[in-house]
Amino acid sequence: MKLGAFLLLVSLITLSLEVQELQAAVRPLQLLGTCAELCRGDWDCGPEEQCVSIGCSHICTTN
């Protein structure tokens, strides 16, 4: 019985860690319903990128 309880505990901890990783990966997708101000001008973007307006959002994209 103790071995079964131990295996259950390890399984739950592993599942919890995997769920936390998935939540962290999904967070950027939450910007889809809101305005994302990721840049204010081309100077906020990388060397081969430019700041563009998409709806109410501003994001960096490659040329």
UniProtKB/Swiss-Prot annotation:
InterPro entries: Elafin-like_sf (IPR036645), WAP_dom (IPR008197)
Function recorded in the entry: May promote activation of the metalloproteinase MMP2.
UniProt protein name: Protein Wfdc21
Disulfides per UniProt: 35-56, 39-51, 45-60
Gene Ontology CC entries for this record: extracellular space
Record-annotated WAP domain positions: 25-63
Subcellular location: Secreted
GO biological process: response to lipopolysaccharide; response to tumor necrosis factor; white fat cell differentiation
Induction: Up-regulated by TNF-alpha and lipopolysaccharide (LPS) in vitro.
Domain of life: Eukaryota
Alphabetized UniProt keyword annotations: Disulfide bond, Secreted, Signal
Tissue expression notes: Predominantly expressed in white adipose tissue and liver.
MF terms (GO), sorted A to Z: enzyme activator activity; peptidase inhibitor activity
